[in-house]
């Protein structure tokens, strides 16, 4: 019978930390998306949505140390840069979106969220790290041998 090698505890801890980071970032992103009206609701005021997004960024930044791992250093650096860029755009959003029509305002909101694309690469890196077995070589072992 074949079994998987044990997972690296440091990789598992980094993954758990990344999940907390992602949850905080998702909540902030949802706050910003709440400004976009739908058929059932008019959309939240832009200033409140931006404030919610910035709060989500702050909460996500607080979780960065939780997924600190040498194998994720590059991904984490790219993520920090992405958070900074998204914050700059979000802070400028009320001024740049003032007076814009619906579609153009939504494009500006999308521009803010597009800055977070490196977070997807960080997630892939964290998942890949988690899949690496604790044993060197990454081979499966035969149970009982």
Segments predicted by a language model, with ranges:
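Long, low-complexity or tandemly repetitive, helically biased scaffold regions used
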Residues: 6, 10-145
